[in-house]
Swiss-Prot record:
The chain crosses the membrane at residues 5-25. Component of the cytochrome b6-f complex, which mediates electron transfer between photosystem II (PSII) and photosystem I (PSI), cyclic electron flow around PSI, and state transitions. This is Cytochrome b6-f complex subunit 7. Keywords: Electron transport, Membrane, Photosynthesis, Thylakoid, Transmembrane, Transmembrane helix, Transport. InterPro entries: PetM_cyt_b6/f_cplx_su7. Belongs to the PetM family. One of its GO terms (cellular component) is plasma membrane-derived thylakoid membrane. It comes from Synechococcus sp. (strain CC9902). Pfam families: PetM. Coiled coil: none annotated. The gene is petM. GO terms for biological process: photosynthesis.
């Protein structure tokens, strides 16, 4: 069970920064 919680946390730690960076890049591209 602990491994499942760790895996889920790891997924969020990876996806959240990617989402933030991806969103920022999209806004930058639309701005240009």
């Amino acid at each position: 069970m602990a491994s499942e919680i760790f895996g889920t946390a790891a997924i969020f730690w990876v996806l959240i920064p990617i989402g933030l960076v991806g969103g920022a890049l999209l806004l930058k591209l639309e701005g240009d």
